[in-house]
UniProtKB/Swiss-Prot annotation:
InterPro entries hit by this protein: MraZ (IPR003444), MraZ_C (IPR035644), MraZ_dom (IPR020603), MraZ_N (IPR035642), MraZ_sf (IPR038619), SpoVT-AbrB_dom (IPR007159), SpoVT-AbrB_sf (IPR037914)
Gene: mraZ
Transmembrane residue ranges: none
Family: Belongs to the MraZ family.
Ranges where the SpoVT-AbrB domain occurs: 5-51, 77-120
Domain of life: Bacteria
Subunit comment: Forms oligomers.
Keyword set, alphabetical order: Cytoplasm, DNA-binding, Repeat, Transcription, Transcription regulation
Pfam families to which the protein is assigned, alphabetical: MraZ
Protein name: Transcriptional regulator MraZ
GO cellular component, one term: cytoplasm
Entry's localization field: Cytoplasm, Nucleoid
Length: 142
């Protein structure tokens, strides 16, 4: 289970150091193998490989009228491995698609991660909070 936010920096080659609190879980759960793909909100999705296989099967089973979404998720997916320093390489194509340059935010979302450009994430979070809670959360207690 992945949760929490981490402010990180991409190096000049597009590598991101995975926070140590996640490395052991990624090694145990996925032998350090992850899959990175596009997210429709403008960030990237990072899945441990076993979770990716579950997601990929769901996407592959979508009806034909969702063929562009299959292309977006599956056609842009890249398999990467944690290197010996605990880093993953984010491809130039995926970095460009998500507007990632240097400062990024890694969010643990349970079974997977989202990777955002830091400024984009801050702006989208502020906009969401300004709109208030959606109806689905109106009766949710904290």
């Amino acid at each position: 289970m992945f949760q929490g936010a981490s402010a990180l920096t991409l190096d000049a080659k597009g590598r991101m150091s995975v926070p140590s609190r996640y490395r052991e879980a990624l090694q145990g759960q996925a032998e350090g193998r992850v899959t990175v793909t596009k997210h429709p909100d403008g960030c990237l999705l990072l899945f441990p490989r076993p979770e990716w296989e579950v997601f990929r099967a769901k996407i592959a089973a979508l009806p034909m009228d969702a063929h562009w979404w299959r292309r977006i998720f599956l056609g842009n997916a890249m398999d990467v491995d944690l290197d010996s320093a605990g880093r993953i390489l984010v491809s130039p194509e995926l970095r460009m698609a998500a507007g990632l340059e240097k400062e990024v935010m890694l969010l643990g979302m349970g079974s997977h991660f989202e990777l955002w450009d830091s400024q984009t994430y801050i702006a989208k979070e502020q906009a969401a909070m300004a709109q208030g809670m959606p109806d689905a959360l109106k009766n949710f207690t904290f």
